[in-house]
């Protein structure tokens, strides 16, 4: 069984994330979505809210075949990959700036465990501009985020900024 790990903070989960999840499902038998506990980022949503958000929004994708497991983690990404039995880490790329950071991460992860590959999926052209940080800023300022997140995630953002 080929297991992939798609890590992120998902604060909030965006349509860009969901696109990568859907496409990654074609590459693996089980996709573990690693919801990172990253205290440095100061998340808007609690870990529990983000896990629930990912679980809820991924039900429809999982219903089309394949297995999705949501797994919170706080340790090194490579340790999380080992913990869940992943042979591949899936990362989404939006722009050249993403690649520079991800390139460094691949080098470090390969040094820690050369047996775990990293696969990059380019963001769909319609989703390249979506970034969780920008979505939060738009929502905070009362803008319409419906082009960037699902209706449930949009409602959760509105509720957070009331």
Swiss-Prot record:
The record marks 17 as: Transition state stabilizer. Its cofactor is Mg(2+). It comes from the Bacteria. Its EC number is 2.7.7.3. Pathway: Cofactor biosynthesis; coenzyme A biosynthesis; CoA from (R)-pantothenate: step 4/5. GO terms for molecular function: ATP binding; pantetheine-phosphate adenylyltransferase activity. GO terms for biological process: coenzyme A biosynthetic process. Substrate binds at residues 9, 41, 77, 91. Its main location: cytoplasm. It is found in: Cytoplasm. It catalyses: (R)-4'-phosphopantetheine + ATP + H(+) = 3'-dephospho-CoA + diphosphate. Keywords: ATP-binding, Coenzyme A biosynthesis, Cytoplasm, Magnesium, Nucleotide-binding, Nucleotidyltransferase, Transferase. ATP binds at residues 9-10, 17, 92-94, 102, 127-133. GO terms for cellular component: cytoplasm. Reversibly transfers an adenylyl group from ATP to 4'-phosphopantetheine, yielding dephospho-CoA (dPCoA) and pyrophosphate. NCBIfam families: coaD_prev_kdtB, cyt_tran_rel. Homohexamer. PANTHER family: PHOSPHOPANTETHEINE ADENYLYLTRANSFERASE (PTHR21342:SF1). Belongs to the bacterial CoaD family. This is Phosphopantetheine adenylyltransferase. It comes from Cereibacter sphaeroides (strain ATCC 17023 / DSM 158 / JCM 6121 / CCUG 31486 / LMG 2827 / NBRC 12203 / NCIMB 8253 / ATH 2.4.1.).
């Amino acid at each position: 069984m080929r297991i992939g790990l798609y890590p992120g903070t998902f604060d909030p989960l965006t349509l860009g994330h969901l696109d990568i999840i859907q496409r990654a499902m074609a590459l693996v038998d089980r996709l573990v979505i690693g919801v990172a506990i990253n205290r440095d980022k100061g998340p808007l949503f609690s870990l529990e809210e983000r896990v629930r958000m990912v679980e809820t929004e991924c039900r429809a994708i999982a219903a089309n075949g394949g297995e999705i497991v949501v797994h919170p983690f706080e340790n090194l990404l490579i340790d999380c990959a080992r913990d869940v039995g992943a042979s591949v880490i899936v990362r989404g790329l939006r722009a050249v700036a993403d690649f520079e950071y991800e390139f460094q991460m691949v080098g470090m992860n390969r040094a820690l465990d050369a047996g775990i590959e990293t696969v990059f999926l380019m963001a769909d052209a319609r989703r390249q501009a979506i970034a969780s940080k920008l979505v939060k800023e738009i929502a905070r300022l009362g803008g319409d985020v419906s082009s960037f997140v699902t209706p449930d995630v949009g409602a959760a953002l509105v509720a957070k900024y009331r």
